[in-house]
């Protein structure tokens, strides 16, 4: 069956329990599967980037499903031979138990593998992952090394989205770069301003008439009354008392010492 035979809008998103309890179980027992969407291939004879072309399903979700014959690495052993032409699949972490929700019985196990390009053990890790599902005998589920049932394993091959991974790495790098710019006071853009604020000392508020400089434009006739000047001078020199001049009387005030009389 090819992808062209699938009904419009078809999506294949089975759960772990469905993959083992229905698809793998019926395949091993020789029972009919309602919709044959999982082909049988010798998965380890191909590199992962060759597998999408072998799938019956469209590759929009970047995951593909296959039934794979269990090829033992050693004639008298139980380990599977997972070497390909360009690299090898390496198991990571512990196998996960897949339990039937209805009976709470362990139906099988899921093993996670990562593809390394090159020869073991010096291969380069890639962004290809795989979940390998295996069916086990119900009577053997309590053993440390369960007796796996059948000649097939069901494999879900996944290609991680490299664009999202790179975008996340770039975002984290930018956040680290921004954070490092402000990690210390020495690199803070506010340091110079802070230094200026700390070094700034306000001038003394004590008015000393001997140290006050008067512009030549401010040299006036002390015998005349300048109300506009006195108003401005009162704001500039609040601690001084300015004269009150009437028509026949003139009162002296301290600021006259700074004025040149005509």
Swiss-Prot record:
Give an example GO cellular component term for this record. Answer: nucleus
Q: Which UniProt keywords apply?
A: DNA-binding, Nucleus, Transcription, Transcription regulation
- Coarsely, its chief localization is nucleus
What are the recorded GO MF terms, alphabetically?
DNA-binding transcription factor activity; sequence-specific DNA binding
Q: Which Pfam families match?
A: NAM (PF02365)
Induction (UniProt): Induced by wounding in the flowering stem.
**Which residue numbers delimit the NAC domain?**
6-160
Localization per record: Nucleus
Task: Provide the GO biological process annotations.
Answer: cell division; cellular response to auxin stimulus; response to wounding
The record's section on InterPro entries has: NAC-dom, NAC_dom_sf
- Which parts of this chain does the entry mark as a DNA-binding region? 107-166
Comment block on domains: The NAC domain includes a DNA binding domain and a dimerization domain.
What functional role does this protein have?
Transcription factor involved in tissue reunion of wounded inflorescence stems. Required for the division of pith cells in the reunion process, which is dependent on polar-transported auxin and the wound-inducible hormones ethylene and jasmonate. Binds to the promoters of XTH19 and XTH20 to induce their expression via auxin signaling. XTH19 and XTH20 are involved in cell proliferation in the tissue reunion process of incised stems. Involved in hypocotyl graft union formation. Required for the auxin- mediated promotion of vascular tissue proliferation during hypocotyl graft attachment.
The identity of this protein, by name, is NAC domain-containing protein 71
């Amino acid at each position: 069956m090819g992808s062209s035979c699938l009904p419009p809008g078809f999506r294949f998103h089975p759960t772990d329990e469905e993959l083992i309890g229905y698809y793998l179980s019926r395949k091993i027992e020789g029972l009919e599967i309602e919709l044959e969407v999982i082909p049988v291939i010798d998965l380890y004879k191909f590199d992962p980037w060759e597998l999408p072309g072998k799938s019956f399903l469209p590759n929009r979700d970047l995951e593909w499903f296959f039934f794979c014959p269990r090829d033992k690495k050693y004639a008298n052993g139980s380990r599977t031979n997972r070497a390909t032409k360009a690299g090898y699949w390496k198991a990571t972490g512990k196998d996960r138990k897949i339990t039937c929700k209805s009976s709470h019985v362990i139906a099988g196990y899921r093993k996670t593998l990562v593809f390394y390009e090159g020869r073991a053990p010096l291969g380069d890790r890639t962004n290809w992952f795989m979940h390998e599902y295996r069916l086990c005998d119900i009577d053997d589920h309590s053993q440390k090394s369960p007796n796996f049932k059948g000649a097939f394993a069901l494999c879900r091959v996944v290609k991680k989205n490299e664009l999202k991974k790179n975008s996340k790495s770039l975002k984290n790098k930018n956040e680290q770069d921004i954070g490092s710019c402000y990690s210390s006071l020495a690199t803070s853009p506010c340091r110079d301003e802070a230094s200026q604020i700390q070094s700034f000392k306000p001038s003394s508020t004590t008015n000393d008439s001997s140290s006050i400089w008067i512009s030549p434009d401010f040299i006036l006739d002390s015998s005349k009354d300048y109300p506009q000047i006195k108003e401005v001078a009162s704001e500039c020199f609040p601690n001084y008392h300015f004269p009150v001049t009437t028509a026949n009387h003139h009162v002296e005030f301290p600021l006259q010492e700074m004025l040149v009389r005509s």
